[in-house]
Every structure is written in C-alpha cells, then in structure tokens.
Amino acid sequence: DYWTALSYYKYFPPPYAMIDCVAADLKLFADLGVDSFYAETADYMDASQQFVPLKFWLAYQLLVDPHQPAEPLVKTFTDGYFGAAAGKMRDYLRYLRGRIDAEAQFKMLRDEPHKLAYLDRSFFQISETLFDEAEALVQAGGLQAKHIEVERFALDGALLFMWPWLERKLPAGETLPFERDTLIQRYERGWKSLISSRYSR
C-alpha cells in the first residue's frame, strides 16, 4: 500500500533520487502502448528527495520521446542548473544512485532507516567532499550556489540524524571527520533555501 509505505519515521530524511525510476517507468509505459497517465507526485514536497527539478524536467522530455537515453538529458539539465559545478553534482548523483542500487533495503527505509547500509561513514565523507568541491566552483550566494545548497540540505539532515549511530561505530578515541556546529549552520541555511525555492514564487 503506497499510502502507508513510508508512514513510519516520517521525520527522518534519508537522501534519495528518483531519476532512474522516471526513465524506466516512462519507457515501460510507452512499450505497453499507454497513451496517457496520471502521475501523483505529492512526495515532491519531501525534503529528503534530491534533484526534484531534474526529475520533473527529465519527465517532461521523456514524455516527448520515452526511448531517448536519459543520461544526455541529465547532462543538459545539470550543465545549465549547476553551471561549473555540474560535473561534481553528477558525480554525487551517480554515487548516490550506485550506493542505493547496490544496497537497496526498502522495508528498512520504512521501519528503521538509521540501519540503512548505504548511510555509513564512507557515504557521508565522499558525499560531503563532492559538495565541498561543487560549492567551490560557483559564485558564493549566486543562483547556482543556491541550487547546490538545496541539494545538500537532505545530505546534511541525514548526517545530523545519523550522528549518534555513526559515533557508536567509531574506534575508541576517534571522532567523526565533520564539524558539527558548521554542519548545523549550513543545515539551517539549506532549509531556508529549500523553502525559498519551493514556496516563494
């Protein structure tokens, strides 16, 4: 029942993207001879879903030709949306998709997301580094920087939520390689950017 599939732990923000689903689903519908369909997307408001503008734009393009390859479209969109940081943002998207695909745990997402295999220390270190590198490539405070900030919000939220579990797995005397105060401040900025991007039209 998709109405209740994610009803538990609703305040936990595990980062994810639906890019692969969009391309595969629309191609399947076309192959089955579907002429039209209604897509309910209430979850676009979900603060943990990343690359939402890309998802919608990609879907519009694939509705015109569902059999065209998705990756060139992803490149076209990200080049314009993230500017000089597009390559780093695609690197993150590929990494996110790869980790989730390799370690898919749907029921865990619903019941115990803090036990998701992909949300480990390595995931956060690699992902945060990619975002650091992406932000360094664009003008601070500019539109492209805001776009990056919105995507980073879900990652930072997940790291803050996972902090206690990540700490428990550390060897004695070791600390997490993140500045918690800096992370909280960036999370607050990201929340404001997210609200502004979605509701201040």
Locations of the language-model features?
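Catalytic domains of carbohydrate-active enzymes that cleave complex glycans
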Residues: 32-34, 58-201
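Structured mid-domain segments that build the active-site/substrate or prosthetic-cofactor binding neighborhood
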Residues: 1-87, 91
